[in-house]
Amino acid sequence: MAAKYLSAANAAALDKDLMSMGAFSLDQLMELAGLSVSQVVYKVHPPSKGRRILVACGPGNNGGDGLVAARHLWHYGYKPTIYYPKPGKNELYQRLSTQLRNLSIPFTDDFPSAIKDSDHIVDAIFGFSFTGSIRSPFDTIISTLEATSLPITSIDAPSSWDITNGPPSSGPGANLMPQYLISLTAPKPLVRYFKGRHFLGGRFVTPEIHQKYNLQLPEYEGVDQIVEVPIEESEEKL
């Protein structure tokens, strides 16, 4: 089945509805999102391809998804390292960080050196709600992501991309094209500009929300929390 994509306004509204109509807490949604991300990494980069996963986290919910994904990856047998230069102030992010430290998962301040010791990168810096200019240190980090030959999995949006117009015309992120992208809940318009493998995660949307937004999403198989959705099947706007 073809997957429609959500406009910027509907994507933000749907997130609110998940917590009001759907009665989900932020903790639950972040846990489910991070679990989906970890399953994508396992699918496209199994441990046999290298266990060293560098997770670059921003200060918001996208970064929180990355922290959750790192915990699951550790339990799968990977060796994650966290780059988290500006930790979010929400108590939830602090607990997620503590959970990782309890597993002796290292945090690094040296992103360029960490890349040299990694096999795969999870881009959890900025999500679909990103707007404005990119501030330090993330401008340099995104430029480093553009230059690396390592495979990258981006969460909901390649960092710096606009939800509707895709990559910026210039500056950091203009040439960022990750190999893998996982859209959370439903694809966003930016997937039209994406050229890699595209996955969907969000096996928790209630029938009521499905109906409200007229979502047309592919079925998940078995116990999978993700499903691969070719870009050409994500074209009709909601």
Swiss-Prot record:
MF-aspect GO terms: metal ion binding; NAD(P)HX epimerase activity; nucleotide binding
Cofactor: binding comment: Binds 1 potassium ion per subunit.
Binding site for (6S)-NADPHX: 61-65, 127-133, 156
Catalytic activity: (6R)-NADHX = (6S)-NADHX; (6R)-NADPHX = (6S)-NADPHX
Location relative to the cell: Cytoplasm; Mitochondrion
A Pfam entry, by short name: YjeF_N
Keyword Aminoacyl-tRNA synthetase in annotation: no
Tree of life domain: Eukaryota
Enzyme class, UniProt record, top EC level: isomerase
Enzyme Commission number(s) from the entry: 5.1.99.6
YjeF N-terminal domain segment(s): 11-217
Residues that, per the record, bind K(+): 62, 123, 159
Cofactor: K(+)
Coiled coil stretches, renumbered: none
Entry keywords, A to Z: Cytoplasm, Isomerase, Metal-binding, Mitochondrion, NAD, NADP, Nucleotide-binding, Potassium
InterPro entries, per database record: YjeF_N_dom (IPR004443), YjeF_N_dom_sf (IPR036652), YJEFN_prot_NAXE-like (IPR032976)
Function: Catalyzes the epimerization of the S- and R-forms of NAD(P)HX, a damaged form of NAD(P)H that is a result of enzymatic or heat-dependent hydration. This is a prerequisite for the S-specific NAD(P)H-hydrate dehydratase to allow the repair of both epimers of NAD(P)HX.
Family (UniProt): Belongs to the NnrE/AIBP family.
Protein name per its UniProtKB record: NAD(P)H-hydrate epimerase
